[in-house]
Regions:
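Conserved PLP-enzyme active-site core in the AAT-like
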Residues: 8-30, 34-272
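Short, small-residue-biased leader/transition segments that mark boundaries at the very start
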Residues: 1-3
Length: 273
């Protein structure tokens, strides 16, 4: 943070951040923004149009707002178990494959992409399994649709895959993260969550058409492409935060704290999701 680069264009801090994001996710095209909802605004300005339908798992409020504000529709395809707050199942944030397939059968020509929120924030931060991500990818490929991850808590999602899904116990968080993102065409990120910083966000993708289409809106709404509303300090901090928070011990510390609180709530009979 102390050696940040405040250059308007071509700041070294941006390239440190870009290299970290690419190493963790595999995505080559990066657009920084000042926070997650700004990333949605920039990308959706290119992707979402009036009358579109965007299916996903319990869209976050800003995601839904950016879709509906463009006179499009956010279609919830979350599994029914997510509505039962006291039901304990490993992956209550999953997309329901049957609901998603039905949406594509009926409205394929109006669907620009499928969005998966990891973890499912609106449904209480419930995780999405790797198997479910593969199912979504297969359905998307069947209908020729891209997949976008809303990734504010992607590292926590990787943690739950490691601790709850068969075959992942011996994989590192970084390995699981890379596998998750291999099933998506792009991501938006609110960095104040799993980036463990107090400001920032970004878009990342391997689709050049998404990058080329969105970058003009970044300049219009956020700033030049190598800072996008973030200063050098914040970009340097985010590069470190993403790296540190994709380590198991760091994630487990916070999740165990939440688990402790949940056990206390159970003692007093207070429901929670």
């Amino acid at each position: 943070m102390c050696i940040r680069d405040r250059s308007y264009a071509g700041a070294s801090s941006f390239f440190k951040l870009k290299d970290t994001i690419t190493r963790l996710t595999g995505f080559e095209y990066i657009i920084p923004t000042h926070q997650g909802r700004a990333a949605e605004n920039v990308l959706f300005s290119y992707l979402v149009h009036e009358g579109d339908i965007v299916p996903g798992n319990s869209h976050f409020d800003t995601t839904k707002g950016h879709i509906e504000g463009r006179k499009a529709f956010a279609l919830d395809c979350t599994v029914d178990e997510a509505k039962q707050t006291q039901l304990e199942v490993p992956f209550k944030g999953n997309v329901d494959p049957a609901k998603l397939e039905k949406a594509l059968q009926e409205h394929a020509d109006r669907i620009p992409f499928i969005i998966v929120t990891i973890t499912n924030n609106t449904a209480g931060g419930q995780p999405v399994s790797m198997q479910n991500l593969r199912e979504v990818r297969a359905i998307a490929d069947k209908y020729g649709k891209p997949v976008l991850f809303d990734s504010a808590r992607f590292a926590e999602n990787a943690y739950f895959i490691k601790t709850r899904e068969k075959g992942y116990q011996d994989k590192t968080i970084k390995q699981i993260t890379r596998e998750m993102f291999s099933l998506a065409d792009g991501m938006t990120m609110s960095a104040k969550k799993d980036g463990i910083v107090n400001m920032g966000g970004f878009i990342a993708t391997n689709r050049k058409d998404w990058y080329e289409g969105a970058k003009g809106f970044c300049v219009q709404f956020e700033g030049y492409l190598t800072y996008g509303g973030m200063n050098g300090r914040d970009m340097n901090a985010l590069a470190i935060g993403l790296d540190e928070n994709t380590e198991f011990d760091n994630l487990e510390t916070r999740i165990r704290q939440v688990q402790y609180l949940a056990c206390k709530l159970d003692e007093y009979g207070i429901p929670y999701q």
